[in-house]
Amino acid sequence: FEYLCYRPLLKRYYEEDSNMRHESAPKPRLTDADYRKDYLSDKIGIQKRLQWTEEKFFVTTEEEPLFDAADVLRFGKDLIVQHGFTTNLKGIDWLKRHYKDHRVHAVNFPGDPYPIHIDATFTPIKEGLIINNPQRRLPKEQRKLFEKNGWEIIDAAQPAHNEPPPLCYSSVWLSMNVLVLDPKTVCVEKSEKYQAEQLDKLGMEVIPIDLRDAYAFGGGLHCSTADVFREGDLKDYFPKQ
C-alpha cells in the first residue's frame, strides 16, 4: 500500500507536465521457480552464507526479472543497483533495457549474508562522498568507477545499539539509513549518536528524528521515503566511465 501515499503526487505531475510518463515494471509471478529450495534453512551456517554471497549465489533465481527499487541508487545519469536477494541479474537487465539514457551498474557486498536493499550498506551523503557499511565493503574492482570520478568512500560509524528493537527484522545498521535533504542537511535517527557525530564532523547539519519505535514496520528514515520528484538539473556525476 506504499504507493497510495504518493499516487496523488504522480497524478498531479501527470496533469501538469505533458512530458511526464507514469510507468510500472512488470509484476513478477513469484512462483517456486523464483527461489532456491531450502536456501534459508537454519541448518546452513553463517560462513557458508558468506561464501554464497561472495559467489553471488542468492536465494532468488533467474526465472524472471526481479528487483526492488530499494536496491537502486540514482546518481544523475547512473543507476547503482545491488545484486542480491531482492534483485536478480534479469531485473538489472530489465532496468538497462528500459532506461537506455542511463548507465546501469551492478554492485554486490560480499560481507552481507542476507543482501536485501542497499540503503543500510551504501549511502551517498553529498556529491563526492559515500558512507559504506564496514562489514559489507564494496569490492575493490567495483570502486574504480567512484575513485576515478573523485568520489570518496568511507566507513560508516558504528551503530549505537547492539541489537534491533522488538519485531524488527532489519539489522542494527539501520543506523546509516539516513535521509539526505540537500548537500548540507541530513536526517538521522535520534538515538544513533555515533552516526550523527560522524556526519556532523563531515560538515553536515544533522536533524535528529525519533523513529526507532517504527523500525518494525520495515526500516529507517530512508526506507520510509520515496523521492518521486527531484529539483535541479540532470547532472553527470560519473563522466569517466
Language model features with spans:
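The feature marks the mature, well-folded catalytic cores of soluble enzymes
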Residues: 1-241
